[in-house]
């Protein structure tokens, strides 16, 4: 069994505020290409953290690929109340995460920032590799998780970068 942690930028970090934004189409094309590659390499579990943006788009791609490929999807939320204050539209997205094959929360409620480090460590300890939409030139809080990933021995990290997306746009033209 091979598990891959899937995470990346949130939609607002990319300046994407509408579900019809054309940038999402490009991002999903990259995700589909990479997911097919991972599946052909033997990945059988995709693990999500339940975040909007890249993770949600990746979840949508994974759900569309489930008819062609044998895979399982998991969501491990940091807290049981994750997303409880999201808008109605985003609640629908949260519901999709809650419909994956395996759903758990690491903590009941937020108590202190140390929980995030423990949560991230748990995810890394229970996955074999990561797929991350992250670019070192556009730092966000993802940098902490990325640093943990790259510091872990024998933990391959596949990065999707803005340069990769530019290549896909070039292929469109």
UniProtKB/Swiss-Prot annotation:
SUPFAM superfamilies: MCP/YpsA-like. It comes from the Bacteria. InterPro entries: YspA. Belongs to the UPF0398 family. NCBIfam families: PRK13660.1. PANTHER family: UPF0398 PROTEIN SPR0331 (PTHR38440:SF1), UPF0398 PROTEIN YPSA (PTHR38440). This is UPF0398 protein SMU_470.
């Amino acid at each position: 069994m091979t598990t891959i942690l899937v995470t990346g930028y949130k939609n607002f970090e990319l300046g994407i505020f509408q579900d019809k934004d054309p940038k999402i189409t490009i991002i999903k094309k990259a995700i589909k290409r990479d997911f097919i590659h991972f599946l052909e390499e033997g990945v059988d579990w995709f693990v999500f953290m339940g975040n909007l943006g890249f993770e949600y788009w990746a979840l949508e791609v994974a759900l569309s690929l489930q008819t062609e490929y044998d895979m399982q999807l998991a969501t491990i939320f940091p807290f049981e109340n994750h997303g409880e204050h999201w808008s109605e539209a985003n609640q629908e997205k949260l519901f999709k995460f809650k419909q994956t094959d395996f759903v758990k929360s690491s903590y009941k409620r937020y108590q202190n920032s140390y929980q995030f480090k423990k949560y991230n460590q748990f995810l890394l300890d229970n996955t074999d590799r990561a797929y991350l939409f992250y670019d070192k030139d556009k730092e966000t809080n993802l940098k902490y998780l990325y640093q943990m990933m790259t510091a872990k021995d024998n933990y391959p990290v596949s990065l999707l970068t803005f340069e990769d997306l530019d290549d896909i746009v070039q292929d469109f033209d």
